[in-house]
UniProtKB/Swiss-Prot annotation:
Expressed in most embryo-fetal and adult tissues. Abundant in primary chondrocytes, osteoblasts, cerebellum, kidney, lung, stomach, heart, pancreas and fetal brain. Very low or no expression in the spleen, thymus, esophagus, bladder and thyroid gland. GO terms for cellular component: cytoplasm; Golgi apparatus; membrane. This is Dymeclin. The gene is DYM. It comes from the Eukaryota. Necessary for correct organization of Golgi apparatus. Involved in bone development. GO terms for biological process: bone development; Golgi organization. A lipid is attached at residue 2 (N-myristoyl glycine). It is linked to Dyggve-Melchior-Clausen syndrome: A rare autosomal recessive disorder belonging to the group of spondyloepimetaphyseal dysplasias. DMC is characterized by progressive short stature with short trunk dwarfism, microcephaly, protruding sternum, and psychomotor retardation. Radiological features include a platyspondyly with double vertebral humps, an epiphyso-metaphyseal dysplasia and lacy pelvis iliac crests. Smith-McCort dysplasia 1: A rare autosomal recessive osteochondrodysplasia with skeletal features identical to those of Dyggve-Melchior-Clausen syndrome, but with normal intelligence and no microcephaly. It is characterized by short limbs and trunk with barrel-shaped chest. The radiographic phenotype includes platyspondyly, generalized abnormalities of the epiphyses and metaphyses, and a distinctive lacy appearance of the iliac crest.
Length: 669
């Protein structure tokens, strides 16, 4: 490091880093700091270069860990950074590139060191290294400062208060990255942490007042999707004597190591990811999700979650109840637009889920929108490409649909939105289809994919619950959607017969076998019968509540009427089959009266006429199908590993050795 450009491989031999980590105590006023902080790196573009940086940092850290208790150099470095941040706002206003660049470099070094410290030492050791004591001869005072707390407060101030300009973009990203790194102790524990330094510093004390401002800033960073300044946008003149501070291209700021603007981390998934258009937005979103999913402290709820649960629209002029802490307002229209545009990433989908599930103001606002297709279509596209998505992303997309379908207004309005030419739907050309029919098609496709591949009962349950919530409001179903409902039932029926046959053979075999354990076909049969009953309830709900709106479903039902024969007398389905049987019988007799060789158009005409003639009181009333999403007990056991896997795979310019990760299983090394 120091005044010339550096290569990562040379870091352990760098004289400035050797001095920082050595045995000599360096005063915070020493000119050394100006020399140390005047460096630029060629930007690493791969996980192997990030790994190289990590290894180089570990080498420096070993020496620092050994000597810092005597030298206090880490504390001095932090003090240098803290003193500089006090002038940062003024420097931004005065366009003081060099000052901002050096301040950024100080934070970059702190972040690299902190990352290794957190991975390799206990919280107690970590806090000792970040406790600053003034070292002077003959001074044995026990007064000390907690620099970790000061650093975190300073980072929160920096993130929330420094104006976002080309020259401050990098330091804003670095401040957010450093907070992510501070919270990363969770990565190195198998169990979810319920008491940690994160809880100690971020949920009480001087950091607490920044809660709402931080959450608001991170949300606005996500909304704005600010792109980084172009490389080489700022050029510092070199000093003619070649001594002192040689800056070369200011890409100290723009092409530095910290501007690795591709998805960081390792593993095949990350390597294949596209470049990020806004590292600041990505990093902000990841930090927001980590904060929102921290467990409650023993004596206080998570304030970041409280802020996320309670913020309101800037258009809402009603006062906040005094009981709501950390309240703030944000532009819901801008947030909605960003959420619609960013649904290609796991983390944006997880944010949408979090807001819909936890913030009733947002949920009410979204459900009142007249352009819901902008939100629903990206979610359907996630489900449509289920083969390319990880299971967590699919779950989040499904749960979002389930939450939306809890609202009757949503279930009605989606059938009124007509879409043209859905290019990503490749099974069939859909020149015109309602959003409701498309939603049904995609959910049924997800169920069929799950039946043949993953066989995940949880996935089935959520898909069927969403269809059930919608069923009473089905309107003008597209003929293809109606066909797919019945063809799914056909698939389930075949599966039922197959499992029933296997169960029968298994029972015969068990009578003649010598205590050989047999598959539990009874359980399989029970699961498939639950799903079949749910499908029958969905069909029944549509026929009972909106028969006159759905001639295509009646047509599909009549076309495959033989499918339902075996379930008429089945004890598990007799009750729910009554209405379906009645509809089939009623319309079959009408078609019979009309004669043979009927065209599709003529059959539909007879159905439409028959709907008017069918006495509604002959259809038995059933309780309305209504399913509500409820988070399972201890949701943090699912969400915390998920969020950190997203950080691991998607954080900008942050690398963790996969062998050190304890929280989740690695897909690949």
């Amino acid at each position: 490091m120091g005044s010339n450009s550096s290569r990562i491989g040379d870091l352990p031999k760098n004289e400035y880093l050797k001095k920082l980590s050595g045995t000599e105590s360096i005063s915070e006023n020493d000119p050394f700091w100006n020399q140390l902080l005047s460096f630029s790196f060629p930007a690493p573009t791969s996980s192997s270069e990030l790994k190289l940086l990590e290894e180089a940092t570990i080498s420096v850290c070993r020496s620092l860990v050994e000597n810092n208790p005597r030298t206090g150099n880490l504390g001095a470095l932090i003090k240098v950074f803290l003193s500089r941040t006090k002038e940062l706002k003024l420097s931004a206003e005065c366009q003081n590139h060099i000052f901002i660049w050096q301040t950024h470099n100080a934070l970059f070094i702190i972040c690299c060191l902190l990352k290794v410290f957190i991975c390799q030492m206990s919280e107690e050791e970590l806090q000792l290294h970040f406790t600053y004591e003034e070292k002077s001869p003959g001074n044995y005072s026990s007064d000390s400062e907690d620099l970790l707390e000061e650093l975190l407060c300073c980072l929160m101030q920096l993130i929330t208060d420094i104006p976002l300009l080309d020259i401050t973009y990098e330091i804003s990203v670095e401040a957010i990255s450093t907070m992510v790194v501070f919270l990363s102790c969770q990565l190195f524990h198998k169990e979810v942490l319920r008491q940690s330094i994160s809880h100690k510093y971020l949920m009480r004390g001087p950091c607490l007042p920044y809660t709402s401002k931080l959450v608001k800033t991170l949300l606005y960073n996500f909304i704005r999707q600010e792109k980084p300044p172009p490389p080489g946008a700022h050029v510092f003149p070199q000093q003619s004597d070649g001594g002192g501070l040689l800056y070369g291209l200011a890409s100290g700021v723009a092409t530095g190591l910290w501007t690795v603007f591709t998805l960081g981390g390792v593993g095949s998934k990350a390597a294949a990811s596209p470049e990020l258009s806004s590292p600041l937005a990505n990093q902000s979103l990841l930090l927001l999700l980590v904060l929102a999913n921290l467990t409650d402290a023993s004596d206080a709820p998570n304030p970041y979650r409280q802020a996320i649960m309670s913020f309101k629209n800037t258009q809402d002029s009603s006062p906040f109840p005094s009981s709501i802490p950390h309240a703030f307002q944000i532009n819901f229209n801008s947030l909605y637009t960003a959420l619609c545009e960013q649904q290609t990433s796991d983390q944006a989908t997880l944010l949408l889920y979090t807001l819909l599930h936890q913030n009733s103001n947002i949920r009410t606002y979204m459900l009142a929108r007249t352009d819901m297709e902008n939100l629903v279509l990206p979610i359907l596209e996630i489900l449509y490409h289920v083969e390319e998505r990880n299971s967590h992303h699919v779950y989040m997309a499904l749960i979002i649909l389930l939450i939306l379908t809890e609202d009757d207004g949503f279930n009605r309005s989606i059938h009124e939105v007509i879409l043209k030419n859905i290019t990503w739907y490749s099974e069939r050309v859909l020149t015109e289809i309602s959003l409701g029919s498309l939603l049904i098609l995609v959910v049924i496709r997800t169920i069929q994919y799950n039946m043949t591949r993953t066989r995940d009962k949880y996935l089935h349950t959520n898909c069927l619950a969403a269809l059930a919530n919608m069923s009473a409001q089905f309107r003008s179903l597209h003929q293809y959607a109606a066909q797919r409902i019945i063809s799914l039932f056909s698939l389930l029926s075949k599966k039922h017969n197959k499992v029933l046959e296997q169960a029968t053979q298994s029972l015969r075999g068990s009578l003649s076998s010598n205590d050989v354990p047999l598959p539990d076909y009874a359980q399989d049969l029970n699961v498939i019968e639950e799903v079949i009953r749910m499908m029958l309830e969905i069909i029944n709900s549509c026929l009972t509540n909106s028969l006159h709106h759905n001639p295509n479903l009646v047509y599909a039902l009549l076309y495959k009427r033989d499918l339902f024969e075996q379930f008429r007398t089945h004890p598990s389905f007799q009750d729910i089959m009554q209405n379906i049987d009645l509809v089939i019988s009623f319309f079959s007799s009408r078609l019979l009266q009309a004669g043979a060789e009927l065209s599709v158009e003529r059959v539909l005409e007879i159905i439409k006429q028959g709907v008017v003639a069918l006495p509604k009181d002959r259809l038995k009333k059933f309780p309305e199908l209504k399913f509500k999403y409820v988070e399972e007990e201890q949701p943090e056991e699912f969400f915390i590993p998920y969020v950190w896997s997203l950080v691991y795979n998607s954080a900008v310019g942050l690398y963790w050795n996969p062998q050190d990760i304890q929280l989740f299983t690695m897909d690949s090394d």
